[in-house]
């Protein structure tokens, strides 16, 4: 079963599932450039976008939120690494960053795209100190920027 069929079986409309195939191909190509090897068998995930209908900025403070998923989202293709580096490349925006799994790393400039992956790497290192392996990750997203979707 191909990626489009799996996405349709998981609930995406046929048209959106087909569009995600192109995003997965873009992410796969970007990962191949990043790792300098073919990535046809690399694991892949689709993360649907969400709209916060009610409760914005309350969920992380213990409050309640009402969310709904949308058919736009982020396509992820990844492979493990043997070191603590997490290389992340955005196939659409052409951005790349390589934080390490360490809670002592310096933060990129505030507001930079690179700050988000760095914060995740720091949090993983802090919460899961036994994690010793990083990953090469390529993403491709059709979430509109600055549209209130996450």
Question: What residue ranges belong to the model's regions?
Answer:
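ATP-binding N-lobe of GHMP and related small-molecule kinases
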Residues: 1-150
């Amino acid at each position: 079963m191909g990626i489009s069929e799996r996405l349709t079986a998981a609930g995406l409309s046929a048209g959106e599932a087909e569009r995600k195939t192109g995003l997965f191909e873009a992410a796969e190509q970007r990962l191949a450039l990043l790792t300098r090897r073919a990535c046809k068998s690399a694991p892949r995930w689709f993360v649907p976008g969400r709209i916060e209908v009610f409760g914005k900025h309350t969920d992380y403070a213990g409050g309640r939120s009402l969310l709904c998923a949308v058919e736009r989202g982020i396509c992820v293709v990844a492979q493990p690494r043997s070191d603590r580096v997490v290389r992340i490349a955005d196939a659409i925006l052409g951005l790349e960053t390589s934080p390490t799994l360490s809670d002592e790393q310096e933060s990129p400039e505030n507001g930079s795209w690179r700050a988000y992956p760095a914060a995740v790497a720091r949090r993983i290192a802090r919460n899961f100190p036994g994690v010793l392996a990083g990953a090469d990750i390529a993403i491709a997203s059709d979430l509109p920027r600055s549209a209130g979707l996450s």
